[in-house]
Amino acid sequence: MPPQRSCGANSTLIRDTRMPRIYKPGSFLRVPLADGSFGYGRVLKLPHDAYYDYRTDTPDSDLDRIASKPILFKIMVRHMEERSWELIGWRELEEQFSQPIVQFMQDIGNFRDCTIFDTVGNSRRAEPQECVGLERSAVWEEVGVEERLLDTFMGRPNDDVERLKVRLK
């Protein structure tokens, strides 16, 4: 069902009435990319996913092979769209995925106001330089993940990743 629109005097509110797709942590996902190749991800503790440094020209369902690859990034993903991501299997999450995921937030008005936090509840104020290399707290749409994976595999910058980097000045 498409989003429903409600109009007010000065603005438009879009209410998404679709239900999210919920994947069990440990699920493996095959992600079709725009060039016809495939990337692979793993559902972590919701809402986080991890994406492997693994790309194939034909679909692969070998969970051992996929799980042996290094992780490119861990991000929050909103699984809402009717896309062609395929659930290809499940297994318990390995020890490497029990480590907290560390991210940052940065105030839009005062770039010096940063917070580093993790998925187990730790949080502290930080200088912008301390946030370099961390993921900004953001929820990605599936199409954005597809673009980011393909850009990474093609060795080119991703517009969303660049836009979300910490501001240093």
Task: Kindly label every feature range from the protein language model.
Residues 7-48:
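Short N-terminal edge-element motif at the start of the domain
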Residues 46-63, 76-77:
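Basic/aromatic-rich interaction segments and small domains that mediate binding to polyanionic partners
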